[in-house]
């Protein structure tokens, strides 16, 4: 009696474990910024940054996009004056090449809201990549 029960239990675990492994949150499209819970979503083929209870912030990046992460997989941010700045990136492989077309847009805290940079940086590099800290500042100082 215990052999069939063990076999049934093993079969159930083989089915359930992969499902559990896939059910975690996607850290590349969901992040915490202090008390804020942020998510990236697709709006008409473009990326939008959404926060519960707030209006969505439409970005200039194509979907899919992701938050720029540090080496440990957490949201990489920089403090610039009174504002916290994060980066959102969208990347696609260049056909017949090892390069990618990557676009980066900065988003900063602004009072109780969020503000996206008007400028977007375009680079030929594939994520994951640790963008220079100047990118966090420069996208707000540049003109589009």
Model-derived regions, located:
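Exposed acidic/polar residues on beta-strands and adjacent loops within beta-sheet cores, strongest
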Residues: 20-144
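Bacterial N-terminal signal peptides
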Residues: 8-18
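Bacterial N-terminal signal peptides that target proteins for export
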Residues: 1-9
């Amino acid at each position: 009696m215990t052999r069939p029960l063990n076999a049934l239990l093993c079969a159930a675990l083989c089915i359930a474990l992969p499902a559990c492994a896939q059910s975690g949150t996607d850290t590349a499209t969901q992040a915490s910024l202090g008390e804020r819970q942020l998510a990236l979503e697709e709006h008409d083929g473009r990326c939008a940054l959404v926060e519960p209870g707030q209006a969505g912030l439409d970005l200039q990046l194509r979907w899919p996009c992701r938050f720029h992460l540090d080496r440990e997989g957490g949201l990489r941010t920089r403090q610039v004056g009174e504002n916290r700045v994060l980066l959102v990136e969208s990347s696609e492989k260049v056909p017949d090449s090892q390069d990618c077309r990557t676009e980066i847009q900065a988003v900063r805290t602004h009072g109780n809201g969020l503000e996206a940079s008007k400028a977007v940086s375009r680079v030929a590099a594939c994520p994951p990549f640790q963008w220079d800290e100047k990118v966090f500042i420069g996208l707000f100082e540049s003109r589009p």
